[in-house]
């Protein structure tokens, strides 16, 4: 889905020790500075406990930011890239055996580094 929107895949499920995981690391070419896009993928079958976006708490955001810092240390070629944190959210994920594929909601700049 994201590649069809113009992003380029770089990595998925990138782990750093016990610090955390980055679901997707994508690249977005821009006119000025290229952008490294960190994408958190969330799924919820039902919204009775909140939406997928609601599940990305401030603590989860801090963990993603810290893991991104480790990623940048491991990949210095991205030092001069802009960084953006996006969320790809799937609501109402079908049960096994259902043919319906949910349409993702892509939230650019879902959160920022404070």
Language model regions located:
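Acidic-basic catalytic patches of nuclease active cores, encompassing PD-(D/E)XK
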Residues: 1-13
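Hydrophobic recognition helices of helix-based DNA-binding modules
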Residues: 2, 71-72
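Residue-level signal for inorganic ion chemistry
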Residues: 2, 64, 85
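A generic structural motif
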Residues: 15, 27-29, 90-92
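Short acidic/glycine-enriched loop/turn segments that link adjacent beta-strands
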Residues: 17-20
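Conserved catalytic cores of phosphodiester-cleaving nucleases, focusing on short active-site segments
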Residues: 22-47, 64
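Mg2+/Mn2+-dependent nuclease catalytic core
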Residues: 44-70
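Domain-level recognition of nuclease-like catalytic cores that cleave nucleotide substrates
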Residues: 74-114
């Amino acid at each position: 889905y994201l590649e069809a929107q113009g992003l380029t895949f770089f990595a998925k499920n990138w782990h750093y020790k016990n610090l955390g995981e980055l679901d997707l690391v994508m690249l977005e070419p821009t006119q000025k500075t290229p952008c490294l896009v960190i994408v958190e993928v969330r799924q919820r079958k039902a919204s009775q406990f909140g939406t997928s976006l609601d599940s990305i708490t401030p603590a989860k955001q801090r963990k993603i930011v810290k893991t991104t810092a480790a990623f940048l240390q491991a990949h210095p070629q991205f030092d001069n890239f802009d960084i953006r944190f996006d969320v790809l959210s799937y609501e109402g994920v079908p049960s096994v055996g259902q043919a319906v594929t949910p349409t993702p909601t892509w939230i650019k700049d879902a959160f920022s580094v404070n």
